[in-house]
Each structure stands twice: as C-alpha cells, then as structure tokens.
UniProtKB/Swiss-Prot annotation:
Present with 119000 molecules/cell in log phase SD medium. Zn(2+) 2 binds at C159, C162, C185, C188. This is Mitochondrial protein import protein MAS5. GO terms for cellular component: cytoplasm; cytosol; nucleus; perinuclear region of cytoplasm; transcription repressor complex; TRC complex.
Length: 409
C-alpha cells in the first residue's frame, strides 16, 4: 500500500506503473500542457504539476520515500516538498530530455553573467610579504546615457515576433518523435526589444552597453598559495537583466631558485662541507623574507647526506590561524677532492674516526680482489650499445656498476 496516490493520479498511471509507463505518461502531459504549446494559465499549472510528479516518480529513491511517507517525507529527503513555486525551471529540463535541446523557453528573471578570470603571477618573496598590484580592466557596463534601455524612455517596445524572448522555436515532427529547435529572433536579433532608429540612444547606438576601463587594486595577502583565488564580486561585464559575474584573479607562484614550498613549509637544500658535517660549524642562507639566517650545527652531531632538519617558525605565513610554517633543511655533503691530504694525516683520521667495518666473507669462499675505476658514461654507453644494451641516462644511475676491474687470485 502507498500512503498517497496524488502524483500517480496527476500522470494518470496506477501505483504499480513501470518506469516506461511513467515516462510515456509524462511525455503525453508535457506535449499537451507545455506553455509554448498551450499558453493558458490552467495549462501552465497542469504542466507544473506533471513536471513535479515526474521528478519524483522517475527517481527510484524519491518514489520509494513518497510511497511510504507521502509528500511530507520528501521534504527531509532532498525531494520537492510539494510542487515547486514559480517558473518552470526543472520541468523545462525534463521536457528538453524528451524533445531535444531548446524545449524550454528562455529562463525568466535575471541571469548571472560569466566570470572574468585572470592570472596574477607572484614570486615566493611576494607571497611571503604580500603584494598589491594595480591592474587595468576593460569591461562592459550599462550605458550611462540611456541607463541601459537602448533608447528614450517609452521608446523601447517589446518585440511582438518573439514576445520579448529574443528567441523563436521551430517544431518538427519526425515520425513518432517531435523535435524543437531554438533560433535567434530575426526581427529583434535576440534582444527581445524593438527601438525605432530615430529614438535610439546616440551614445550606445541602441546597444544598451558601453565600454569602460577600470583600475582594480589586487591584494595578494601574505601566505597565499598557488591557485588561490582573489574575487571581485560583480565586477565583470554588465548587461540588461543580467547579474554581473565576478572578476577572479588566480595566483600563480613562480618557481624559486633556492626554496621549494610544501604547503605552509619551505624546503631548502643546504650544502655543507665534510668537516662541518662531522665536527659542527655554521652555514648561512638568504631567507625569502630578505633576512639572512645563520644556522649552527652542534659539535658532535653528525649530519649525513640527505638528512633533514627543521627550523621552526621560518616557513610561510599562515593566513587563517596566524604564525608561520617551518623551514625544512635537506643536507648535501661536499666531500674533499681526491688526495686532499697526506698519508700521515689520513692515519691521524684513522685514530680519530670510528674503526672501519671489516667485510664478513665466509672462510671457504673464492675471493676476487677488485679495484674501483672512474665511471665514464660515454665510454660505457658505447660499450653497451655494441652489445645491444640500454644507454646510461646520467652519471647518477648505476654508479660504479661497470667501473670495477677485477683480477682473479
């Protein structure tokens, strides 16, 4: 048992109707009562009712709720909550699904215009400190002379050919299907109005709009991120009966030579010498704030290649919550050149540094004594190519793989 049968009765189908039967019933009602075919108020009301009924009964989830709880149950389940008031918004969408694009009349009431989007480029320093830019915008505004009418007061008449819609519909029947095509009115050229040439506004020549150049101050706030939007509400092009869209500036962060950004944090790759890495010392870096940071490494703390450390509060500003992110330091170690010191000094290093790790080789294993040679990518690419192998892309790949010369013992 269903709680209510109202929507079924409107479409003239039983409560056991299939989806196909409901669709056919709505199609029949839409053809009969659509405002473009039947302009009477009674037909308009019946079309709204049929559209609301089909909106519910064509959706399995909404239909199930309606069957169990009636219209009251739909108000809490994203349903219509009764018939929609005013206009033919969603009913027209359903109608167009059956009969092709252009089934609906032009939407009533003011429409929203398109947004105007621009990219604003900013360096990491500018995103840290903030920046204000003055940008010129060429936009369309309502004519000040005629206040957007296009002519003298009382001289603008509604186009009788399209009934002020600016569009016309052509209906064709192709077999059992009806197709409707929407075209621009050839009398008013889509404006919906007729203005006698002698009464046209001399400033805009009846176009109702004119061009204006406006300067906008764009504030890039400290801590803004790549892709963030700065919106000027209602500053896009104006047109009669149109709500102006927005002017939107999209922040584009330029790459930095020293820093990378990770959310509110900054990442910096610091190269230090081997002595500083193992015995402590200092290094310095120029921060995006413009200040220099002197960073100390405590003696006794060993910095390994690729190790990461953090300096708290030296990242990017955090706009919503205040404070700053962190500065993450990733270390690379600059090793000395070959033969940088004497054998005597190397022996002293042996006494200072932890003992060497002795390789563990099984007693009965066959041992080859090998010597490392410098790796030359060009040389080994030629060798591999002659064997049909792949080339090395860089000297960072497979380091030393074929740079070992062995002599059997």
């Amino acid at each position: 048992m269903v709680k209510e049968t109202k929507f079924y009765d409107i479409l003239g189908v039983p409560v056991t109707a299939t989806d196909v039967e409901i669709k056919k019933a709505y199609r029949k009602c839409a053809l009969k009562y659509h405002p473009d075919k039947n302009p009477s108020e009674e037909a308009a009301e019946k079309f709204k009712e049929a559209s609301a009924a089909y909106e519910i009964l064509s959706d399995p989830e909404k239909r199930d709720i309606y069957d169990q709880f009636g219209e009251d149950g739909l108000s809490g389940a994203g349903g219509a909550g009764g018939f929609p008031g005013g206009g033919f918004g969603f009913g027209d969408d359903i109608f167009s699904q059956f009969f092709g694009a252009g089934g609906a009349q032009r939407p009533r009431g003011p429409q929203r215009g398109k947004d105007i989007k621009h990219e604003i480029s900013a360096s990491l320093e500018e995103l840290y400190k903030g920046r204000t830019a003055k940008l010129a915008l060429n936009k369309q505004i309502l004519c000040k002379e005629c206040e957007g009418r296009g002519g003298k007061k009382g001289a603008v008449k509604k186009c009788t050919s399209c009934n002020g819609q600016g569009i016309k519909f052509v209906t064709r029947q192709m077999g059992p299907m009806i197709q409707r095509f929407q075209t621009e009115c050839d009398v008013c050229h889509g404006t919906g109005d007729i203005i006698d040439p002698k009464d046209r506004c001399k400033s805009c020549n009846g176009k109702k709009v004119e061009n204006e150049r406006k300067i906008l101050e764009v504030h890039v706030e400290p801590g803004m991120k790549d892709g963030q939007r700065i919106v000027f509400k209602g500053e896009a092009d104006q047109a009669p009966d149109v709500i102006p869209g927005d002017v939107v500036f999209i922040v584009s962060e330029r790459p930095h030579k020293s820093f990378k950004r990770d959310g509110d944090d900054l990442v910096y790759e610091a190269e230090i010498d081997l002595l500083t890495a193992i015995a402590g010392g200092e290094f310095a870096l120029e921060h995006v704030s413009g200040d220099w940071l002197k960073v100390g490494i405590v003696p006794g703390e060993v910095i390994a290649p690729g190790m990461r450390k953090v300096i708290e509060g030296k990242g990017m500003p955090i706009p919503k919550y205040g404070g700053y992110g962190n500065l993450i330091i990733k270390f690379t170690i600059k090793f000395p050149e070959n033969h940088f010191t004497s054998e005597e000094n190397l022996k002293k290093l042996e006494e200072i540094l932890p003992p060497r790790i002795v390789p563990a080789i099984p007693k009965k294993a066959t041992v080859d004594e090998c010597v490392l040679a410098d790796f030359d990518p060009a040389k080994y690419n030629r060798t591999r190519a002659s064997r049909g192998g792949a080339n090395y892309d860089s000297d960072e790949e497979e380091q030393g793989g074929e740079g070992v010369q062995c002599a059997s013992q």
